[in-house]
């Protein structure tokens, strides 16, 4: 019988998948993994066999961190690709540690664009609760942004900001 050798990529993917499987065995509730933002070459670059790992998880967590989202097409494109590629739900994370009005405006418009995708959730990474309030207050008090949401049909964002307006 001829011995079959695994390629480096196959061996690494099996090793990572086994690690995820072992970790899942230790978890009693929902189980998710955070994956690097490369939906195309995840196996080759990181040893992630997304189909095999998808059989083990309840959802995938995809962080798309950035210092700002002034140019947001990359975040929308990657999010769309992950939703299309993965066979489990996707939870997207964006960075919200944005102290300037311009950065908050770009962040919230990016959230609006990705909210049109079939994501389970969009998480905003913040430093503290004041940072969270800053994001919400900016959205509530910025009539131009709220008008932009309405003009371009971002009904879900309008609903969310209207809810924030009851608190802020």
State each model region's role.
Residues 1-10, 83-97:
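Long, low-complexity, intrinsically disordered polar/charged segments
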Residues 1-56, 62-68:
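Polysaccharide-binding and catalytic clefts of secreted carbohydrate-active enzymes
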Residues 20-31, 80-90, 143:
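Surface-exposed amphipathic alpha-helices with a cationic face
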Residues 23, 48-50, 78-81, 110-111:
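Generic recognition of flexible, low-complexity loop/linker segments
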Residues 24, 54, 83, 114-115:
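N-terminal cationic-hydrophobic initiation segments that often serve targeting/anchoring roles
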Residues 56-79, 88-168:
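Substrate-binding cleft of secreted/luminal carbohydrate-active enzymes
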């Amino acid at each position: 019988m001829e011995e079959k050798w695994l390629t480096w990529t196959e061996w690494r993917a099996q090793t990572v998948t086994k690690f995820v499987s072992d970790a899942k065995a230790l978890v009693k509730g929902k189980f998710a993994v955070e994956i690097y933002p490369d939906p195309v070459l995840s196996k080759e670059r990181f040893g992630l066999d997304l189909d095999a790992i998808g059989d083990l998880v309840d959802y995938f967590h995809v962080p798309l961190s950035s210092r700002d989202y002034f140019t947001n097409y990359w975040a929308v494109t990657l999010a769309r690709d992950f939703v299309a590629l993965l066979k489990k739900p996707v939870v997207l994370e964006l960075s919200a540690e944005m102290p300037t009005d311009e950065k908050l405006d770009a962040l919230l418009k990016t959230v609006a664009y990705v909210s049109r995708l079939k994501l389970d959730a969009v998480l905003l990474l913040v430093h503290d609760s004041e940072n969270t309030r800053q994001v919400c207050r900016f959205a509530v008090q910025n009539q131009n942004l709220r008008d932009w949401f309405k003009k371009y049909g971002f009904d879900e964002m309008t609903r969310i900001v209207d809810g924030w307006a009851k608190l802020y």
